[in-house]
């Protein structure tokens, strides 16, 4: 990673600030400067602006070398450079300036690719693409917009280009163009062994031919300078020949042998070309190679060796060739200002999101934040269709009313005021000048932003008000010298997340103010903020619409989680929690040490379990080895273990006397309805571990769903009446409509005739069942002989794979682990036949991870689920087993029973 040598990141205020050193400001004074120094200053300012545009916006601070009592303009050269950077005459769209005494500031708004002038903009901002192409006889540098279109076309071309016999797409254009280059009139000269000084070539410059002279004695430096750009231009167009040693009149001059020798010419050319960066969209094995050939031809004068002509034949490249790494910068408080490498730059430029890789995504999910109009670091955000949109979530959680300043959540405000007598008066004094907006209170805003909690903080309050920038108030009981740093860091993180996660594209900086209950004099009492810099009024939220836009970005910041679809789609996307899930997650952990969460199938219990473990780490400043996650089955254990947020074990391992529990303080139990007591009292042991530090007991949260009970034995849970405090998750977010309808019917059957091991009171939750209706899904129930069933499943899997699904989308589940072991090899064998008989290269079909038992697969999900003869060995839980099976399927559910050949029957719902 290349860091900037002369740009420093400052920590003095809650914004991303780059200090650019001493700079001359003002047109008159800049015109008097030494041209080299003026250019260096301009480059430094432009690179700082590029870094901030690409990193969420911020502030460029500089010390004015020319003292002035009156405001001065920036300077025409600086303004022009910034306009060229954003490719727009409207500099005010991204920049504002302010002079304070001898300090000059440029306020930078985050870059976004939203088309403001009707033209498409690239995903990131760059000073130069380092991509070249040929235009008739010229080498042309592509600007960022042209580079974006070029890369987009290359990616699309590779994606849809046919191949012969499975050959990499890269091989086809290279072979096709070989004959074209050899038929070029320059090829005959390229093949020559000697030429005459002063000879006139019979062809001229063209798209595929360029003449350059050795016009300097510094031959090697000259070649290193020109070769990369021409290699890029020819390779990105149709290939061609670079003649070094021919003038514009087609006369061969060569390079005198006194200035260079033959071997060094070829070595310099080859070494220079070997350093040229390339990027592949295709599957070419020649990942780092430009295909070229260098010839050094002797040039004779009157029969004597005079010098050498260097000719480089360049073949067209399958993807993209650069002259050097693109010139694009980013900034981070930890890394400083750093330059993107070629791969990082290309991936950000052509990051179109998951729409291009999944046609079904738009059918099943609604886009909440798209990459096509958001800042560079944003990830796309989707919610399952039928769930609340970010606009609806904002209205429910953070509603803004005209001429009304509200405190939210009201219950927390009342609780805090009852605990701290001076709090109400102090806060009201701070915000008395605001009449429209919200004061959003948290015990710790830091925890909800994935930062460490500061225990001395009574609460944090975020003010979103009209005619004001956002202000974060940190309220302390006693004076604390670290309080302002905490507040600044929290505000800075919030601002960055509003832009880079929430997708907010307006101007924003979260101002800070630390208040102390014990102090008799909190100096600023008019709602102002502690900041050494006066921000422009454009950073104020001007009206309710701007407040709502910011609050919708805040909804994404607070409710997002990494979608399980990310791994399947090959790119990171985010989903949003439901309001019901968020309300459980936002509970104060210090006040809710123990909690039973009852959730209906597909309501997101495991998601909440993962999110709560992340919150535990930040609230209690603990490491992953202090948090223990316990479940019944190995697949769910492995899934959680891969997240690296805790130590994950099965209940059986937890109860093993060899298992050491000394380091654990917090315990999360998932799928607890399927626990057993055969190895001892797991509940008593877990509770004792979480309570062993009496002065600060740990967290003990239990997630369960009695409807998904898969056995009739004692679970070890306390009586239902003693499961308190208790919360419920009743909104199904996983399954398609037809599957959800099936779940509802099975839930009612269990409710009407429950197994004796399930407490009847726990089943009343079924009356609250609801799901998001809009994703269709389908269910099919069939009866087959074993032989026909194996063929049916293999055919269906093959069809799904041809439609673009992967093996990670499919699960084949058996009633018991014994049946899985008995029949798995038969299903695998039939699937391998399909692979061998087709052109599809699914070598990984040999992997058996898609096969499991219904019980072991508890807590996991797949788009497509086959249930193989789902008949419970214990009749009272037959509907529970069916419910467990169905709840694993998001879109397609196949319930397949064994029958005699004569007994085949079929029912379908779709």
UniProtKB/Swiss-Prot annotation:
Its Gene Ontology molecular function terms?
Answer: ATP binding; RNA endonuclease activity; zinc ion binding
One matching Pfam family = SLFN-g3_helicase
User: Looking at the record, which segments are called N'-domain region?
Assistant: 1-354
Q: Which family does it belong to?
A: Belongs to the Schlafen family. Subgroup III subfamily.
Question: Has the keyword Nuclease been applied to this entry?
Answer: yes
Q: Where in the cell is it found?
A: Cytoplasm
Entry's Gene3D superfamilies? Answer: P-loop containing nucleotide triphosphate hydrolases (3.40.50.300), Schlafen, AAA domain (3.30.950.30)
Q: How is the cofactor bound?
A: Can also use Mn(2+).
UniProt entry keywords in alphabetical sequence: ATP-binding, Cytoplasm, Endonuclease, Hydrolase, Immunity, Magnesium, Metal-binding, Nuclease, Nucleotide-binding, Zinc
Q: Output this protein's name.
A: Schlafen family member 8
Gene behind the chain:
Slfn8
**What is its induction?**
Induced following infection.
What does the entry's free-text domain comment contain? Shows a pseudo-dimeric U-pillow-shaped architecture of the SLFN13 N'-domain that may clamp base-paired RNAs.
Q: Which PANTHER family does the UniProt entry name for this protein?
A: SCHLAFEN (PTHR12155), SCHLAFEN FAMILY MEMBER 13 (PTHR12155:SF43)
Q: Tell me the organism.
A: Mus musculus (Mouse)
What are the EC numbers? 3.1.-.-
> What's the top EC group for this one?
hydrolase
């Amino acid at each position: 990673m290349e860091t900037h040598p002369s740009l420093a990141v400052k920590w003095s205020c809650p914004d991303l600030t780059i200090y650019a050193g001493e700079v001359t400001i003002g047109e008159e004074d800049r015109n008097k400067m030494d041209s080299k120094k003026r250019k260096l200053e301009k480059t430094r300012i432009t690179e700082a602006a590029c870094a901030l545009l690409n990193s969420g916006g911020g502030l460029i601070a500089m010390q004015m070398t020319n003292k002035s009592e009156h405001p001065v303009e920036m300077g025409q050269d600086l303004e022009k450079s910034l306009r060229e950077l954003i490719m727009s005459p409207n500099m005010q769209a991204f920049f504002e300036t302010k002079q304070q005494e001898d300090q000059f500031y440029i306020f930078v708004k985050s870059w976004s690719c939203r088309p403001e002038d009707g033209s498409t903009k690239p995903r990131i901002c760059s000073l130069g693409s380092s991509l070249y192409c040929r235009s008739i006889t010229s080498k042309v540098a592509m600007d960022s917009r042209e580079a974006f279109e070029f890369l987009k076309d290359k990616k699309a071309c590779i994606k849809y280009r046919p191949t012969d016999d499975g050959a990499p797409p890269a091989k086809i254009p290279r072979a096709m163009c070989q004959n074209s280059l050899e038929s070029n009139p320059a090829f005959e000269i390229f093949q020559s062994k000697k030429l005459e000084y002063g000879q006139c070539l019979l062809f001229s410059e063209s798209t595929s031919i360029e003449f350059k002279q050795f016009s300097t004695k510094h031959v090697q430096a000259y070649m290193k300078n020109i070769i990369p750009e021409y290699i890029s231009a020819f390779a990105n167009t149709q290939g061609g020949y670079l003649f070094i040693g021919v003038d514009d009149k087609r006369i061969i001059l060569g390079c005198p042998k006194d200035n260079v020798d033959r071997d060094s010419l070829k070595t310099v050319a080859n070494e220079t070309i070997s350093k040229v960066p390339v990027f592949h969209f295709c599957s070419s094995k020649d990942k780092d190679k430009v295909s070229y050939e260098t010839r050094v031809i002797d040039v004779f004068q009157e029969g004597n060796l005079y010098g050498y002509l260097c000719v480089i034949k360049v073949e067209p490249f399958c993807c993209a060739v650069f002259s050097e790494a693109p010139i694009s910068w980013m900034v981070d408080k930890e890394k400083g200002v750093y330059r993107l490498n070629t791969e990082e730059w290309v991936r950000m430029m052509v990051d179109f999101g998951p729409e291009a890789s999944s046609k079904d995504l738009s059918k099943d999910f609604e886009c909440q934040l798209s990459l096509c109009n958001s800042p560079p670091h944003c990830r796309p955000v989707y919610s399952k269709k039928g769930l609340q949109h970010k606009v609806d979530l904002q209205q429910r959680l953070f509603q803004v009313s005209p001429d009304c300043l509200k405190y939210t959540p009201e219950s927390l405000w009342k609780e805090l005021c009852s605990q701290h007598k001076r709090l109400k008066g102090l806060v009201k004094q701070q915000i008395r000048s605001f009449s429209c907006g919200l004061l959003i209170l948290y015990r710790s805003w830091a925890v909800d932003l994935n930062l460490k909690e500061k225990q001395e903080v009574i609460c944090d309050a975020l003010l979103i008000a009209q005619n004001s920038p956002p202000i974060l108030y940190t309220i302390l009981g006693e004076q604390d010298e670290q309080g302002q740093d905490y507040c600044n860091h929290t505000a800075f993180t919030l601002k960055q997340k509003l832009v880079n996660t929430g997708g907010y594209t307006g101007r924003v900086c979260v101002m800070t103010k630390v208040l102390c209950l014990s102090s008799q004099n909190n100096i600023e009492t008019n709602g102002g903020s502690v900041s050494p810099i006066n921000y422009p009024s454009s950073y104020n939220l001007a009206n309710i619409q701007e407040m709502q836009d910011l609050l919708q970005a805040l909804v994404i910041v607070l409710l997002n989680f990494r979608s399980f679809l990310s791994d399947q789609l090959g790119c990171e996307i985010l989903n949003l929690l439901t309001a019901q899930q968020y309300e459980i997650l936002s509970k104060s952990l210090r006040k809710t040490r123990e909690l039973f969460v009852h959730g209906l199938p597909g309501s997101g219990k495991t998601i909440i379990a993962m999110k709560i473990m992340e919150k535990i780490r930040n609230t209690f400043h603990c490491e992953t080895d202090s948090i223990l996650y316990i479940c019944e089955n190995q697949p769910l254990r492995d899934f959680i273990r891969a997240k690296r947020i805790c130590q994950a074990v099965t209940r059986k391992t937890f109860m093993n006397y060899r298992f050491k529990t000394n380091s654990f303080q917090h315990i999360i139990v998932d799928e607890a309805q399927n626990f057993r007591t055969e190895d001892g009292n797991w509940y008593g042991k877990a509770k004792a571990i979480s309570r062993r530090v009496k002065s600060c007991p740990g967290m003990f949260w239990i997630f369960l769903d009695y409807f998904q009970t898969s056995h009739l034995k004692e679970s070890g849970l306390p009586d239902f009446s003693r499961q308190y405090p208790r919360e419920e998750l009743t909104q199904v977010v996983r399954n398609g409509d037809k599957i959800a309808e099936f779940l509802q019917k099975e839930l009612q059957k269990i409710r009407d005739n429950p197994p004796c091991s399930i407490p009847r009171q726990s089943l009343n939750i079924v009356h609250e069942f609801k799901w998001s209706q809009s994703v269709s899904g389908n269910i099919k129930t069939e009866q087959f002989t074993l032989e026909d069933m194996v063929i049916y499943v293999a055919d269906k899997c093959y069809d799904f794979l041809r439609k673009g699904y992967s093996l990670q989308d499919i699960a084949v589940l058996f009633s018991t682990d014994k049946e899985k072991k008995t029949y798995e090899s038969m299903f695998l064998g039939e699937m391998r036949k399909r692979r061998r008989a087709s052109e599809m290269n699914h070598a990984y079909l040999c992997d058996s991870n898609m096969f499991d038992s219904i019980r072991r697969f508890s807590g996991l999900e797949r788009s497509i689920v086959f249930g193989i003869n789902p008949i419970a060995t214990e009749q009272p839980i037959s509907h529970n087993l069916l419910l467990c099976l169905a709840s694993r399927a998001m879109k397609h559910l196949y319930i397949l029973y064994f029958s005699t050949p004569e007994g085949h029957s079929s029912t379908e719902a779709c």
